C-alpha cells in the first residue's frame, strides 16, 4: 500500500510539473500531447461524448460537483484571498521591511577594514607557518628521499609514459565538452529567454523600488564595491598561486610540450624550439639592456600582465596552431621585471632568487617557531612518558582484573564443593544402622532411611574432611599470592622498555633537529653575509641565534636526562595489587568462619547421635527396673487388700458383738438365743483365722 501511495504521489507531482512547464515554456509536441491527455476536462468531454453510462449517470453529479467547486472558488476569491493579501502586505510592511531597513543601515555603518586586516594577518601567519613546516620537516626529508631513491628520475620516466595518454584524454574530454555545449546551448538560450521574460518585469519593479529607497540604493552600491574587491582579491590570489607554482608548472608544461612534439611533425618542433630560443634571447637581451624593457614593464599593470601570461601559457599548451611563443616570452619578461627601477641591483636580485620574498622575516619566524617546537617537545617529553605508562598500566590492569576474577571464581567453586561435601557428611551423621547377625556387616542409611551411605561417619572421618577443606583453602590463597608476585617484575621491565624506547626516539629527534638547524644556521650566516652591508649587526644577530641554539641544545640534553631518571607513576598497579591482597584476606576470613560454623554443627550432630545411642543402650535396663517396680507395686497392693479385708472382718465382729449385747440387754427369748449362738460360733471362727 505504501508503494502504491508513493507511486501515485510521484505520478501526480510529475503530471503537475509537466503542466506547469507547458504553461510557462515552449515544450515539445510530445509533451503537449501528454499534457492534453492528462487534463481532467479533456477526459470529461471524451467520456460524455462516447460513454452513455457516464453521460447519463455520472455527468450530472460531476456537474453538481463542478458547481460546488466553482462556488467554493468564488467564495475563496471574494472572502479569503483579499484577507490573505492584506495580511501578507501588513506582514511585509510591518515586519519584513523594517528588518531589511535595519540590516541595510547596519551594513552601511559596518566597518570592513579591521576584519579585512585581521583576515590578511591570519593568512600571513598561516603562510609563514606552512613555509616553516615545509622548510623544516618536508623539504629535508623529501630531499633525502629524492637523493636516496632518485624519485625525480622515476617521476620523469613515469610522466613521459603517462603524459601522451593524459593529453589524449584531455583532448577527447575537450571535444566531448564542446559537443555537449553545442547541444545544450540552444536549450539553455530558450530557458534563459523564458526566465528573462518572466523575471524581467519583477526585477525591473524591484529595481525601481530600490532606486527610490536611499538605503537600498546605498546597499547595492556597497555590495558592488565588495564584489569588485573580492574579484580583485581572487585575481591577486591566482597571480600569487601561479607565481608560487611556476617552478613546478614550467617543468610540467615542458614535459607536455615534449610529448606533444614527439607526436607531431618535425617542422612544428623546430618552430617551437626556435620560438623558445627567441624568447630566451629576448629575455636575456632585455635583462642586460634594462632601459627600454624595464621602463615599459614599470608602467605595465601587474594584473593584466599576469593574466596575459596565464592565457598565453594555456594557449601554448593546448593550441599549437597559433605561434604565440614570442608574445609569451615578452609577457613573462614583463611579470618578472615589474619592480622599481631605482631598487634594481644584481646582488639584490641574486639574494631574492635564493631566499624568496621576505626571506629575513621568514627566517625569524622559523627561528621562533623552531624554538617553540623544541621547547614544547622538551618540556612535554616527561608528560608523554607518563601518558604512555598510564596507558600501558590501564590496559594491563584490565587484563589482570579479568584474569584474577576468573581465578577467584575458580577458588570459590572449589571451596563450594568442599562445603557441599561437609554439609552432606554433617547430614549423614544422623543415620540409621543395621547389623547383619550372620555376616557381621553393618549397613547405614540416611535420616530418611531411603539412601544407603557409603560409610559410617565418625569423628575421625569428619576431622579428615575439615583438614582437606583447610588445606584446599590454604593452597588456593597461596597460589593467588604467588600469581601476584611476578606482576611487579613484569610491570617494571615493561616500564623500563618504554623509557628506553622514548629516550632513544627523543635522542634521534634531538640529534636530527640539532644537526639540521646547525646546518641551517651556518647557511643563514653565509647568506646574511652577502645580504647585509653592516657586518656588526649581522654578527650580533648570528651570535644571538647561536646562543639561543646552544641553550636549546642544553635543554634537549637536560630533558633527555630527566626522562631517563624520572620515576614512573605505578599508582594504578599498586592499587590493583592491594585490592587483590584485600580480596584474598576477605576470602580466607569468610571461608575460615564458615568452616568454624560447619565444625560446630558437626559437633552438635555428633553429640545428638551419641546421646541417642546412649539412650538406646539404657532402655533395656530401664525396662527391667520398671518390671520390678510393677511387681513390687502389685505385691504391695495385694497385702494392702488382705489387711483391709482383715480390718473389715474385725470391724464386722465388733459390730456383731455390739448387736448381741444390745439384744441380751433387751430380754431373753427363744428366737434371740439362736442368733447369738451363731454369732458366737462365727466370732470364734474369725478369731481362729
Swiss-Prot record:
The keyword Mitochondrion is assigned to this record: yes
Domain of life: Eukaryota
Residue span of region Disordered: 259-308, 610-689
Keyword vocabulary terms for this entry: Coiled coil, Mitochondrion, Ribonucleoprotein, Signal, Sporulation
Classification via SUPFAM superfamilies: Apolipoprotein
Entry's family note: Belongs to the SHE10 family.
Reported function: Involved in spore wall assembly. May be a component of the mitochondrial RNase MRP (MtMRP), a ribonucleoprotein endoribonuclease involved in the cleaving RNA transcripts to generate primers for DNA replication in mitochondria.
Protein name listed in UniProt: Outer spore wall assembly protein SHE10
Source organism of the structure: Zygosaccharomyces rouxii (strain ATCC 2623 / CBS 732 / NBRC 1130 / NCYC 568 / NRRL Y-229)
